[in-house]
Amino acid sequence: MKQKREIWIDNVKVIACILVILGHFFQSMLKAQIVPGNRIYLWFNQSIYSFHVPLFFICSGYLYQKFSRIDSMSKWVRNIWKKLLVLGIPYFVFSSVQWLLKTMFSNTLNVEMDGFLQVLFAEPLSPYWYLYCLYFIFLITPTFNSGRSAVFISGTALILKLLKINGVYSNIYIIDVVMSNEIWFAMGMCLYAINITGFSQKKAARNLGCVSFIVFLIASMIHIPDTLFWEEGKAFYTGIWACAAVILLVAYSFRNSEQDTGFWGFFAKYTMPLFLMHTLFGATVRTLLLKAGTDSIAIHILIGIPVSFIGPVLLAEIMRRYRLDFFLYPGKYIFKK
């Protein structure tokens, strides 16, 4: 029997994607010295970076536990091969394109690029590091098949995170990034195991979501350091409240929805293209405006933000028409039923 689609998952990813796009846009504006790094900007950047990508990991963990059963070597091998194609093809394609563009326009963008192989295999670019990290999380994480396995996997993920918070590093990128993010993936698996969708039918979910949001706001404003990001401990503790607020409020709001429509339906359809291509369009617009001698904050925002959203959507439609959306959704073509 086909399982009912859970609309709230799509819409949580929509929120995460929008915040990722805005975060990258304004961060690149700061690096190009177009916007000042004042307290308001620092608070915004620190706050959203504590939870926007964690939301993606939580959604991935939830869907992994819901649709997969990795309890044998043969299933593990099949899953890893599938994830290598589904995540690896867009990762390598769009990482290569971004590396090429940033290398060509490094002087204008005020960035210094690492070597091509270094970027692909050792220190991925944003936002593609998420796909890179997610693959390795799939590589090491079995699904829960009992309460004991749930405790073991979640406990291990928490220990890894606490070690990282307390300064235990390997100085190997992939190990450190998995240590940071395995916990969010495990949280997503736990949410499915405890039936968060069922809980979202109750008003208690809405109330808890509101409380979580208030706690997040208070925690985020207690101390705003002169850095782009909080230290890992504060980002984790604050991010938990933000993720809880988003998930509970979105799940409650869409508890009776069977399909996305309007704003949510549109963005849910294009989450992957937006995630993969927003930096390409944003960087291109910023480069052209700077080359034209325009450093007005208003002009960069009024042109750059719409193009960061509209550009990927239009290109995704063109790619779909010529079946080039294979590079966005390789699984749609490789694993046809």
Stretches with model-predicted labels:
Residues 1-159, 292-337:
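Membrane-cytosol interface segments of multi-pass membrane proteins
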Residues 21-25, 96, 155-168, 210-225, ...:
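Aromatic-anchored segments of alpha-helical transmembrane domains
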Residues 29-34, 103-108, 163-171, 219-229, ...:
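Juxtamembrane "helix-exit" motif on the non-cytosolic side of transmembrane helices
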Residues 43-53, 118-132, 165-187, 220-246:
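Interfacial loop-to-helix transition and helix-capping segments at the boundaries
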Residues 64-72, 142-147, 187-199, 222, ...:
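Structural signal for the C-terminal ends of transmembrane alpha-helices
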Residues 108-121, 135-143, 164-171, 197-198, ...:
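Short juxtamembrane and helix-loop transition motifs at transmembrane-helix boundaries
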Residues 143, 148-155, 188, 194-217:
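Hydrophobic alpha-helical segments of polytopic membrane proteins
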Residues 198-266, 270, 280-283, 288, ...:
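Alpha-helical transmembrane segments and terminal signal-anchor/GPI-anchor hydrophobic tails
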